[in-house]
């Protein structure tokens, strides 16, 4: 499969490397509006400068591409994704699906009308840590899940568009964790209460810290807290998690997974908590491909053979509604129902 990559700076580096590693995907061309980025990346990745175009329509006209990879900032996703599908091409886009819920729904509408694949790069789903958590929860070993907590604290200095966003943490980072909640629970959010704020030392223009309480179908509850301007004791990018289950607890800390199971509940003895087994560290699931490599492989398979692709625009719109529901709850101070 031959692809046009739109945007080759910043996060584009990750996709340049993923395509160059793939035995099934090659570059037909690139789109980059910044001449300095085009020059630097052509040298760093040995790209043919003649294949770097200024616009997607120009690249579509000049190449024989089969698909498009969109790595532009969110405000351009609607334009790029719809242009690709209007040209008859499947598209794999970086998250978020779009910069606004209206734009995201417009992309979904075109995907539905055209029947073309529009995939969203929710790469955090495809990591050994994530797949192990999902497998343990689905096994039923710890019984029914009643509640979960997630905490994320880091202090990255990105520069660029993220530092100008109104809700940088929620829209650009927490979207991963909210999407993982959907994956882990097999449910969509139904009601959200949330607050966001910006600490005095923040280098972000918008709110870089937030806390949320989420209710899912069947009354399952989740709490989330996070910050993108934390100054110490950082969590991993995957966040720390705690899953409260019927017969034990699954805890994730610093990318390590621990389980402890309840062996006997001392219901008749006041003040006694019951008997538990020893805390076990769970081995991580082995994966032949991870992250963007996994997504690229699955996208290629789905686009060429019609196999299923989990994070289509049609599925991911529920993650977008979740994310924008959190932002609406932060802005309004009221509980948002989805």
Where do the model's predicted regions map?
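N-terminal Rossmann-like dinucleotide-binding module
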Residues: 1-47
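Beta-loop-alpha module in the N-terminal Rossmann-like domain of NAD(P)-dependent dehydrogenases
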Residues: 15, 34, 51-110
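Hydrophobic residues in well-ordered beta-strands that form the structural core
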Residues: 5, 70, 93, 99, ...
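C-terminal helix-rich "cap/oligomerization" subdomain common to oxidoreductases
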Residues: 67-69, 217, 298-338
